[in-house]
Structure formats: structure tokens, C-alpha cells
Swiss-Prot record:
Xref: PROSITE patterns: GATASE_TYPE_2
Gene: queC2
InterPro entries, per the entry: GATase_2_dom, Ntn_hydrolases_N, QueC, Rossmann-like_a/b/a_fold
Protein name: 7-cyano-7-deazaguanine synthase 2
EC class: ligase
Amino acid sequence: MCSVTGVLIIKPENYEKIEKKLIQILKRAEDRGRDSFGVIVIEKDGSVRKVKALGRPSTQEEKLYGILDENSKVIIANNRAEPTTEYVRQKTEEDIQPFEGERYIVTHNGIIANDLELEKKYNVIRRTKIDSAVVPPILDKYWNGEIEQLKKILNDIKGSFAFIIGDKKRPNRIYIAQNFKPVYMMYDRELGAIFFTSLDDYFDASAFDSVTKLDPYSIVEVNDNLEIRKIQLLDKKIKKVLVIASGGLDSTVAATYLLRQGYEITLLHFNYHHKAEEREREAVKKIAEYLQVPLIEIDTDLFKIIGHTTLLKGGGEIVKDRLGEEGAEFAHEWVPARNLIFYSVALALAEAYGYDAIASGINLEEAGAYPDNEMEFVRLFAKLSPYATGPNKKVEVMMPVGNLVKHEIVKLGVEIGAPLHLTWSCYEGGQKHCGKCGPCYMRKMAFRINGLNDPVEYEN
């Protein structure tokens, strides 16, 4: 839709260099908007200077030079891609962002679907049909500059947004409010300025620059003393958790741990034509019954279609060299994108059926061999989550045993009373654990390290 840009100037004496960097950001931001661009600068005394034009800044760069001076404090800017629903044939300056109110200046990326309703509810008048133009008069009339009050106003907006807001009465600060629309922040210590824009690529930052992605569903206030205040737009507390459960040690301990912490959990199990499908299914059913929690099963042929893994029936032999140590140290039984697919399905179910979070048995031990067991996989998926769910339906991603190795998981499981005796860890689907695959090796060693007898039986 658009790219939003903002700058909070800490060292006004560097205004010429800051101006050059701003222009470069706006030129790169044409990636998200080529129909018009605008820049409004708030001076120390609250007065403003502005430039607005149709088309691209790269073809009209000369209009931007000289917009800053030694008294400039806050810059609010926009590169607009005009959506079909807001096409204006004969545009005037009033149709070009940023929009200016008596006190507040606003640049907006997104769509406000209920702009007409907001206009009536707050009894305000805007000067253009553009949806974003309804925001400054509402803020002028109802917002006192405190982010807690801004939250109440933003909760009335139906749609998507990333706002960057300047305050003429307090030109020593800048505000950023967003749901799932992205905003990045970069502090340029050398220039003495804090830059904000829609994608980090627009900064052209070096490896040593401080670049931060601001959290979705948050409001951030930054002042020129380098103080940051932040609140969350959503007050949702985590109560219901959907746990991806294989029937093995890790997910069983993870589920039990969450249950003991007071969460309402449901187990989610996938049957995907893997060698141990029947044994895992039997195990997870008994575990759900033991913990007295619901179980959701999903049967899928997807991995049979993908193939290229020995973990599936008919897929080849499981590696059992060195009594299983070889399988514990390398991902011989890798299943392409399995955890990503499991997590994506879990996320969809969580959103659809009102779960607050998803979790699994991903752990530090298996991260040594499997990329999708790495803690970073979970962290990155958690960051993806707000962009994969509907507006205001944020689903958290938890990893209860993500920082534990196998013997620590066994120790925790014993301490919290997890039904370890019901679990199935083996890659094979025999009557007993084979004792020679990677998971069997790790399981046996984990119990041995803890000085405990493993409650399951092995063939050897």
C-alpha cells in the first residue's frame, strides 16, 4: 500500500546529512509506493515545512533538498501506492500523505475499512475521501498525547495500519503504532538521528548500524533523550495451548509442563505414513487419556507425496551405526519441511478454534542435527506468526523444552510426573524400541545419565 517514514532528530546541527539520508530512504521506498510522496517537518517551535508531489521522489529529488534546517526536529513522510478502493482521478495536495491536523501529523500504511463509521462516531470532518485522513482530526479532538489513550482510539479501527505520528506541541518525540504492518527503527549515532521506515532494506544500513524491527500490535513512543516507551495493542493472555505431540519424550514433557503451569492444553498429532505411525498413534492416545486432555489427529498423505526420507514406510533403512550414536549426531532421517508444515497447520487451527498459543517438543538436543529443531526456528516462526494470522488474532509460539537437552528433559519429566512410560521414541514401528536408532540411543543415554531405569522395553 505505502511506505511510512519518520525521523527523530537528536543532533539538529547534522541536518544536511540527515536530509540526504532521508532522501535516499524515500527513493528506496518507491518499492512500496510510486503514486505520490510527501514530507512534513516539525520545527522546534511547532511550525511545519512540507513538500508534497505526485509521482516518484527519484524523479523530483530537487523538491526535497532544503526542507530541513538547524531547527528541524521531527520528519513524517510517505510514499503512496494508491489502492483501487481509494483512486482519486484529480488529486490535490489534500489527497497526498502525510495528513496534517491542528496538532498531529500522521503517515499511514494500510487500509481503514471503517473510516466512514469512525467519521460519524467521533464527529469529525476530513478534507479528502482517503481513509487515512480521518485519523488526524480524531487525534486532535480526542488524544492527549499519552500512548495508553491512543490505544483506546486505535482499537476502534477496523483494518490494517502502521502509523508514524508527529506532535506539534511536543516536537521532541515521535510515535509509532502498528498492527501487522511492519516498521523498522535505526539509530544512526554518527548523524544523531533515529530513522523509521517500512522495510529495513530502505535504510541501507551497515553491519554495525543498530536496526530493530518494532513488534507487531504495539505502540512505541521515542523521545530525543533516547527513552522508549512501549505498550501492546492486544491484552490477550495465554490460556489455551495447542501442543504438537508425537507421542515421544519431548512433546509429552512439554505438554505435561504446560498443564502443570495451569494452561488448558490440547494435543495435536499427525499421522503421515511414517514407520512408527501406529506405535506413535497408540502412545499419544494413551498420553492424552492419562493427562485427561483432548486430542486432535490429522491424517495426511503430503509427506508421502514429498518423499525423499527414510522415515516413511518404504523409504529405506534407518541408520543404526555405532548403536544409534550416528543417527543422534546427524539428520539422516530428515523429512523435508516437516516441522514448518506441522507448525503452519497448528497455527491455522489455533487461529480458527481460539487457541492462544501453539507449542511443541522442539529441544536443544535435536537442534544439533535438525535445523527445524533449532530454537531460532521457533523464534523466527513466532515472528512470522502475526503475518500469517488474521487481524487481531495473534497466536503466540511457545517452546517449553526448547533450551533443554535430552537428559534434562527426562529429569524434568520425572519431576513433574509426565507419563514417560507411555511414550514412544523409536523411528521403527516394532513391538519394542529397536534400541539402535538415533532417538533410541538418546533416550537410553538420557535415562542412564539420570541414574534411572527406562520404563520402556528394547529389542536388544
